[in-house]
Regions:
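Residues at secondary-structure transition points
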Residues: 15-22, 30, 45-49, 53
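Recognition helix of helix-turn-helix DNA-binding domains
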Residues: 34-69
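Short, flexible helix-to-coil linker/hinge segments that flank and couple to helix-turn-helix
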Residues: 1-18, 22, 26, 78-79
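Actinobacteria-biased recognition of intrinsically disordered, low-complexity terminal regions
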Residues: 81-83
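Short helix-capping/turn signature of helix-turn-helix
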Residues: 32-35, 75-78
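Charged/polar positions on well-ordered alpha helices
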Residues: 43, 72-77
């Protein structure tokens, strides 16, 4: 945890993002990449309905109602994260 903060320059991690499971984070990345549920499912070897369930869960955890809000959030995270 401390090493992760140092890698990010000492800034605290967003607790909403920290609450996401690794699979939800992968799906969030797919959303940010502009992929459909079907495309995300094909990439992650999941059924489209399963992806839809994950999307609903991650939207709830992030406090969003729209997929586009999640895409903007993920894009902003990418922009502010350090390599």
């Amino acid at each position: 945890m401390v090493l992760e903060r140092l890698r990010r320059g000492g800034e605290p991690e967003d607790p909403r993002y920290a609450a996401l499971s690794p699979q939800e984070r992968r799906i969030l990345k797919g959303i940010a990449d502009g992929l459909t549920n079907r495309q995300i499912g094909a990439e992650l070897y999941l059924a489209e309905k399963t992806v839809k369930n994950y999307v609903s869960s991650l939207l709830h955890k992030l406090g969003f109602t729209r997929r586009t809000e999640a895409a903007v959030y993920a894009a902003e995270r990418r922009h502010t994260e350090r390599p």
